[in-house]
């Protein structure tokens, strides 16, 4: 069972990730061990549990770098993660950010799937209110046919961009996020071959049963995932203070569905890997700066 996704902000060295067998961490990842790990944290004891590890790739474009070079590094990162035994690679959806290349997760997955063999690939995530659930079902149904048993579909309701891009370029209306629960159910119906619309089927997509993961950083996502009986991926890489509350609620209120009889939790955390502590600290500082640049400066090179 998967325990967590690591939000790895890539360094210029494409293979700057740690071996799953030796990773030490002080954040909870294993869903079945969360309670015990939380107790250790409160007692001040170090946590060194093993977990299935994954990577969330923003596909950063560094200063002086081209989008093509960023894509090439993403391919190398996925290949190295596969060699090291990581469970999956997920790709984000952001728009109008000059330092983030990942605007179309499905296209990236299609490309990187052809360059890898086993590692699972998915979206972390598709911002569903930006899209038609039907089109997303077709896209990820296509990916599942190309790479069977390797595709994940993480969905969120955030815009993934600024308000100007949201309203004018993406043409997303102000109330689209309010339809997120219904959009998730509609999307799932297409993938299960049980379309809500008579005579309409996702081809490809129907009966592929691509697993849907609800992404969130608040109680809203936890509540929705529990109600629908879907896996839950919590964004503790930017909202760590809510991790325990959200995952505990999700597990306690989980309603089994046809596909998932038990709750399934993924926790996103920030990890910086390097050969020495000093190098890791320096890389961490660069990561913090890049995050400010991407989100506060809309990806401009500040």
Task: Report residues per predicted region.
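Intrinsic low-complexity, disordered N-terminal segments enriched in polar/charged/small residues
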Residues: 3-7, 27
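An alpha-helical appendage that flanks or caps ligand/catalytic pockets
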Residues: 38-49, 167, 173-202, 241-302
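A conserved active-site cap/scaffold subdomain adjacent to cofactor or substrate pockets
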Residues: 226-234, 238
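Hydrophobic faces of well-ordered beta-strands that scaffold small-molecule active sites
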Residues: 53-57, 89-91, 121-123, 151-155, ...
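N-terminal beta1-alpha1-beta2 module of alpha/beta enzyme domains
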Residues: 37-121
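Acidic (Asp/Glu)-rich catalytic clusters
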Residues: 48, 109-117, 144-150, 226, ...
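Flexible, glycine-rich active-site loops centered on histidine and acidic residues
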Residues: 49-67, 129-192, 232, 240
